[in-house]
């Protein structure tokens, strides 16, 4: 039987022939294409013998394998069709089935095999008899792709799996085993054996290593079964190799992918079906000159430090930058590495699982800037710079289309800028120390300012004046000016031939090399010579850093604008500190010093300026002026108080009708298309028509949308405010740091065209320039600031006839959106209060934004504020170093976006010690009915608040030794809630401070001559809405809303302090209110605060003699070291005078009425304690710790002024006690810091937020973070996470200290602002939380996530100043204690805020559907979350969209903290109840009280750790 079977099988095998062509080796004959025909050779029968024995089941294996091998072949179909049509083959297969079944049935094998013949065609099987026919079955010819003949070995009784021999290609791809040589020989013998008359048609290689398989395994091998038992257990080898052997390598997806990726392609391109331009998206372009991005500023370098940090990354609108040569002694500008910022650097979200976020390094000194250090590059001489530029040019061309990514994602491509410097270091040729630059601007620059940049300038090339400049160190070209670029292509701009677009100081600033991909050159002048011997102390360097610090918010710098004459305000701002950093050796830095402009001629920017040798001397530096040490210029530091970021009006201009439309509050015009028309307006249904006037749409917006009230008590339009503010780069940078709302696209937000109504906003620009070049004559007297710098000052008699006329014209011409740059000729800039557009149509709500006139100021504030800057002012700023970087505010504002204007005005919290503040005098606004009372006794000052014409006698006129009346609000504004001050006391606000030097603003008579000038009174009905009484409409009462309590909340920090010292001359000449002011009398032994009852005019200081001015310290050098109090005054010797700060909780400091106000005047030692009768909270506490109401005069020199006030009627007007002025300038006189009580919280310790403490905490936090990194590198993850979390807590603590000063502004000198610090800290806390989760420390993770929530909510709080107002609204609503609670409950407002009833009230007041929140089960069960929701939705929808990212992060942190907490609960033991209670308390704690939260967190950590080690 065995022999017969073998014989039959051999015959069957030999009967198979391959007729045709075969490809490849015999073992893989014709696998890929039909190479021939298969036929069953008729060799005389299947063996001639009998029966079933002639049919060997192994033939079935052969056939099966043929099928299986060809299963995935394209020949399979043809093969099956051919086989199925052949009867003989059917007979053979039927016989095989019967023979093969031998004891195995389909039932036994299971349905998965589908009956053994499931692989066969469904033809009727032939009876067994046919299969036993003596004649062999002949397989008809058919195409075959490949064969897999398997011949069993002689020793094997059962079927064996024989592996097909594959061609070389399959061997290479799938690495299949090949038979050993013995196997090959053996198979060859098998093929050649047999009857000689029969020749083998095919050569078969058999793998003798295959294991024996049962029938089920065979079927499984055919792919008919995926059962692991058959395919894996029975034949592990087959199961592993089967997929490989059955797929064609070129048809498998994996194979295709391998072919795509493993073969090198010429050019390094990836073989991919994707378009090449799509693949390029993966590539990141790098700035060509990145390696030159350059050195951190050196403490010894004075000039560069001022500008080195201003990079295009900070200001997204760097449309163009020009390459400047760097001087031998100057350092290259370096680009701070920004964290990404979304803003915040688009902070890595807390959900981000990436690497540990890098928190910006915070400098050891709080005043120093901590931009991440970039690799220092060598200083390049002029020649070296030229060579480098030439070398760079080629790469610039190559990188022409590359994106130079800065923070603002500004896309710019410069082909090349070739700078040639001619003997820049040669003073003989250039006596001014200026380098003549011939800048060949190859204008292949394609500037694309992303929408986020906020500066797609719409202005036409003839309106370049309106084009804002993003940073002081950057030149900007409007994309719209491409035409002018083309015209100027290849044009050589000579320093003498083109008006300077930068102040001489500006020339010094380095242009950011990386963001524009170009190198920078400093053309300021012989910086090497000037810097020689002018080393700046470390303190100065840190102060520089302070000013240079840039946050990478997508916010453009709001404080810099390009002046119409091409000057860049930003650069002027750089020198805000009394030109401390000016090259004082240059007598006058005139326009000869030409900043190679970015190819735009002066015409481009000034709308047709003198292109010839028209010289602009932005600032004349007195050569004799001493370079005051930074230590003595602390006042300037204070003057650089950062403008608080406040909701600003966003405007959009219709491209069709050229009409400006006010956007709803919170809506950013960046979201609008570049081409915008009135018809696209959707927020005012039915008013999307160009036929409607601007006023109509504006009024509609005012009516429909709640106008955010100035948050920091800063009158929005304060000219002085903005002017001084704008003057400092610090302010500009700080504004960015504060995360002010992004300026809307320049195309949408630029001020209305200058000549919109035929009025030239800069009619006197040329005249001003000429005046600057020529010395001031006639009316102007030179005022020497303590810094030794001189400024021209108009000794004008403040008759506002001209001012009023101009102002009316401006209003008529609807230049409301512009700053009025045409102040009266005789009005010095320092007295100019507000240039912002007073809205004739806007309601009072709108008023704060457009005018510095507080509602109380009524009609009068405007003239002084509107036209304050006169030509004399221009000369002052332009020609005097004393202005220290003060740029011409008129020019500034005209070029600023409306939103920027508003912000600047709003953020002008820092009173500038420069002329504007040096000469600040108290502007007292008299009520309308009391105009007649302007006559003042020489020693008497009538402070009229209401119709009650009450006068306050300055019984003890305090003699002022050497100080002019300077109101100096210290950086303290930053530390204290400016919004409260400004909100409550717009007059006391910084803007008002600038308007009213002392913040002491008595109401003016509505009938005063200047009252007619103001348009603020025109919309009385709207004003009425916000006023409590008509009297208040003209009183100096603060800006009012319908809710009086609302104002009270903001009044908490009305600590405005003013030195009210009137010079004896002015006192004697008290007849003219306009001349009267608060000044320090130099001749007397006692400082006598004289409150002059000037009308709305800002008192100019005519009374001061030149000599007096020289003696007087205008606070230019005053040190505002009282961060918490914000007011510090130094005498001539730089000694700090006592600082007096008052917090008036009532609407105003009682000036009239029943309350008697005794103000202690400063004694010899400068000790002054204000005593207020209005409220206990109004008492100012001195840092000395003495009782606020007690004054202990040292020498009996303290004099009291009795001021009777009626708090109820005088809401809003506050007379802050005059700052004490040191009589002798004794060094012993120490400045005393006063802390303003916060309404909600106890007064913060005076030293809590001092730079020393904050700096120490920052250093500790940074060191801990670095230690954490090192530990993590060593593998100690848990300890690393613990230390990192400790660093987070310290960062939060520092942020809370900074927060104490002012909610909407960051500390003036701080290297980082509060918002950014909170954001970065939240990111770091998120990292710590994820680490704790990974380490299964769920309690710690819950605490870390809580910190994430707090940090991001605080960041959102700071990013949107409107939160302040809404927060106060929440607090006001919370005043009504819930049932069962007394109003005097010890529960804080924050706790009340979390009360469900309070939330419901607030939500309803904000127009939200309370029912929606009530229906939320989470809200109902989680009061804390409801508090967050109330806060989040306390804005209108547009504001909500802006802050959605931060709030999302905060809520994510809340959710994860709860999740981690529950995970912790699931694994704790009973003895850990204390830890649970503390943890619960922390998680439910409000984010407002950061310090309290930190204490709870530390306590909770101690408890958790203690329980862990029990």
Curated annotation (Swiss-Prot):
<feature type="region of interest" description="Disordered">
    <location>
        <begin position="1003"/>
        <end position="1050"/>
    </location>
</feature>
<feature type="region of interest" description="Disordered">
    <location>
        <begin position="174"/>
        <end position="198"/>
    </location>
</feature>
<feature type="binding site">
    <location>
        <position position="690"/>
    </location>
    <ligand>
        <name>Zn(2+)</name>
    </ligand>
</feature>
<feature type="binding site">
    <location>
        <position position="657"/>
    </location>
    <ligand>
        <name>Zn(2+)</name>
    </ligand>
</feature>
<feature type="compositionally biased region" description="Polar residues">
    <location>
        <begin position="1026"/>
        <end position="1040"/>
    </location>
</feature>
<dbReference type="GO" id="GO:0005634">
    <property type="term" value="C:nucleus"/>
</dbReference>
<dbReference type="Pfam" id="PF07496">
    <property type="entry name" value="zf-CW"/>
</dbReference>
<feature type="zinc finger region" description="CW-type">
    <location>
        <begin position="645"/>
        <end position="698"/>
    </location>
</feature>
<keyword id="KW-0479">Metal-binding</keyword>
<feature type="region of interest" description="Disordered">
    <location>
        <begin position="1149"/>
        <end position="1194"/>
    </location>
</feature>
<keyword id="KW-0539">Nucleus</keyword>
<feature type="compositionally biased region" description="Polar residues">
    <location>
        <begin position="781"/>
        <end position="790"/>
    </location>
</feature>
<dbReference type="InterPro" id="IPR011124">
    <property type="entry name" value="Znf_CW"/>
</dbReference>
<dbReference type="Pfam" id="PF24756">
    <property type="entry name" value="THD_CWZF3-5-7"/>
</dbReference>
<feature type="compositionally biased region" description="Basic and acidic residues">
    <location>
        <begin position="454"/>
        <end position="465"/>
    </location>
</feature>
<feature type="compositionally biased region" description="Polar residues">
    <location>
        <begin position="1162"/>
        <end position="1182"/>
    </location>
</feature>
<feature type="binding site">
    <location>
        <position position="654"/>
    </location>
    <ligand>
        <name>Zn(2+)</name>
    </ligand>
</feature>
<protein>
    <recommendedName>
        <fullName>Cysteine-tryptophan domain-containing zinc finger protein 5</fullName>
    </recommendedName>
</protein>
<keyword id="KW-0805">Transcription regulation</keyword>
<keyword id="KW-0863">Zinc-finger</keyword>
<dbReference type="InterPro" id="IPR055300">
    <property type="entry name" value="CWZF3/5/7"/>
</dbReference>
<feature type="compositionally biased region" description="Polar residues">
    <location>
        <begin position="174"/>
        <end position="196"/>
    </location>
</feature>
<dbReference type="GO" id="GO:0008270">
    <property type="term" value="F:zinc ion binding"/>
</dbReference>
<feature type="compositionally biased region" description="Low complexity">
    <location>
        <begin position="1003"/>
        <end position="1016"/>
    </location>
</feature>
<keyword id="KW-0804">Transcription</keyword>
<comment type="function">
    <text>Binds to histones H3K4me1, H3K4me2 and H3K4me3 in GST pull-down assay. May facilitate the recruitment of effectors to mediate gene expression.</text>
</comment>
<feature type="region of interest" description="Disordered">
    <location>
        <begin position="582"/>
        <end position="616"/>
    </location>
</feature>
<feature type="region of interest" description="Disordered">
    <location>
        <begin position="768"/>
        <end position="893"/>
    </location>
</feature>
<feature type="compositionally biased region" description="Basic and acidic residues">
    <location>
        <begin position="768"/>
        <end position="780"/>
    </location>
</feature>
<feature type="region of interest" description="Disordered">
    <location>
        <begin position="449"/>
        <end position="497"/>
    </location>
</feature>
<keyword id="KW-0862">Zinc</keyword>
<feature type="compositionally biased region" description="Polar residues">
    <location>
        <begin position="467"/>
        <end position="476"/>
    </location>
</feature>
<feature type="compositionally biased region" description="Basic and acidic residues">
    <location>
        <begin position="874"/>
        <end position="893"/>
    </location>
</feature>
<dbReference type="InterPro" id="IPR056406">
    <property type="entry name" value="THD_CWZF3/5/7"/>
</dbReference>
<feature type="binding site">
    <location>
        <position position="678"/>
    </location>
    <ligand>
        <name>Zn(2+)</name>
    </ligand>
</feature>
<feature type="region of interest" description="Disordered">
    <location>
        <begin position="555"/>
        <end position="574"/>
    </location>
</feature>
<feature type="compositionally biased region" description="Basic and acidic residues">
    <location>
        <begin position="479"/>
        <end position="497"/>
    </location>
</feature>
<feature type="compositionally biased region" description="Basic and acidic residues">
    <location>
        <begin position="556"/>
        <end position="574"/>
    </location>
</feature>
